């Protein structure tokens, strides 16, 4: 009875409208790069995508919302509401999840798929501890690879064995050379690299030796050839400063004046000294005994004066050898070589 009352042409039109609306609904969603802990979608990737198109990449964190909303609503969601509501994750299981190299998908305690670090350690022959480029000792190379996967993508093994305070017994791989930095830590560095010419004035660096280096690469190379740390005084070309007032340090650093050579250098002064009774007292270059090296640094930052360790223990306990003091002239506690050699 109903079909007899509707014109055949009207049925064709209704069928066309139905399929158009169905297709439009399938295309009207928004694709997001992640689902936050609050359950909302965050980091908008693309609008007007179907769930199938949004989720075909295989990324674990990709999510989708079906609401077809205007730009104003999207803006409010992202800025004021912590993301878009009704967030649908693309992946509910680990099936076809691509976590990338060194990772694999596992279901967590909440029965949700998560990418976890799982480096391939099957080809590692050295099973003992290794020293990383960050100056930390890892129990083995596999532990270092996991740390690299989690938070340090540039982390590499610099030499086998625990990190050392001297180049003695350090076997550097390939053509790299062992140098000791200003905090008395041994690092393996490459001296034969070719440094490109600077393309910007911002690349110039002033070394603790009062010499201007064209770039961090040039400072690395000079450090390597010297065999011990030069250290960074401040960014930019070296100037004939009369005091720290003439030196502009980057954010978070403070100028300390070295009265011995009449130069200033920028240092990090935000270190808090732990309350530990195990620290060894040090005799500083101002002939004052400090309870620890950290306490000496704290005093230096407070006074705006560069202080260096002359020797361990009380200043009254050892008659300093002038030759040894000369050897430590360029020591600097503010800029570990890891930050200089890996720029």
Curated annotation (Swiss-Prot):
GO function term, MF aspect, one: calcium ion binding
Matches recorded under Pfam families: FOLN, FST_N, Kazal_2
Gene Ontology biological-process entries: negative regulation of activin receptor signaling pathway; negative regulation of amacrine cell differentiation; negative regulation of embryonic camera-type eye development; negative regulation of embryonic pattern specification; negative regulation of horizontal cell localization; negative regulation of neuron projection development; negative regulation of retina development in camera-type eye; positive regulation of retinal cell programmed cell death
Occurrences of domain Kazal-like (ranges): 99-165, 185-240, 263-317
GO cellular component annotations of the record: extracellular space
CDD domains reported for this sequence: KAZAL_FS (cd00104)
Region (Disordered): 315-343
Expression sites (tissue/organ): Ciliary ganglion neurons. Levels are higher in the iris than the choroid.
Chain ranges of the Follistatin-like domain: 93-116, 166-189, 243-267
Name used for this protein in its record: Follistatin
Lineage: Eukaryota, Metazoa, Chordata, Craniata, Vertebrata
Designated gene of the protein: FST
């Amino acid at each position: 009875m109903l079909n007899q009352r509707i014109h055949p042409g009207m049925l064709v039109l209704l069928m066309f409208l139905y399929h158009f609306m169905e297709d439009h609904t399938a295309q009207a969603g928004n694709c997001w790069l992640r689902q936050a802990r609050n359950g909302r979608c965050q980091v908008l990737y693309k609008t007007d995508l179907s769930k199938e198109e949004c989720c075909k990449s295989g990324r674990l964190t990709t999510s989708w919302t079906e609401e077809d909303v205007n730009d104003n609503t999207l803006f409010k969601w992202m800025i004021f509401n912590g993301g878009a509501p009704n967030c649908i994750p693309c992946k509910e299981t680990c099936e076809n999840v691509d976590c990338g190299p060194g990772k694999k998908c596992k279901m967590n305690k909440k029965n949700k798929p998560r990418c976890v670090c799982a480096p391939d350690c099957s080809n590692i022959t050295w099973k003992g501890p290794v020293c990383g480029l960050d100056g930390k000792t890892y129990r083995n190379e596999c532990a270092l690879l996991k740390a690299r996967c989690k938070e340090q993508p540039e982390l590499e093994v610099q030499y086998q064995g625990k990190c050392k305070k001297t180049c003695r017994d350090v076997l550097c791989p390939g053509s790299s050379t062992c140098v000791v930095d200003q905090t008395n830590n041994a690092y393996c560095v490459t001296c034969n690299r070719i440094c490109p010419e600077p393309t910007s004035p911002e690349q110039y660096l002033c070394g603790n030796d009062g010499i201007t280096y064209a770039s961090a690469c040039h400072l690395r190379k000079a450090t390597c050839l010297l065999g011990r740390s030069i250290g960074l005084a401040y960014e930019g070309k070296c100037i004939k400063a009369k005091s720290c007032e003439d030196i502009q340090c980057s954010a978070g650093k403070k100028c300390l004046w070295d009265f011995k050579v009449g130069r200033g250098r920028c240092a990090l002064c935000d270190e808090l000294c732990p309350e530990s009774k195990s620290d060894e007292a040090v005799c500083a270059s101002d002939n004052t005994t400090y309870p620890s090296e950290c306490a000496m640094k704290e005093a230096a930052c407070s006074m705006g004066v560069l202080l260096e360790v002359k020797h361990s223990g009380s200043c009254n306990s050892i008659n300093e050898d002038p030759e040894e003091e000369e050897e430590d002239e360029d020591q600097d506690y503010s800029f570990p070589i890891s930050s200089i050699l890996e720029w």
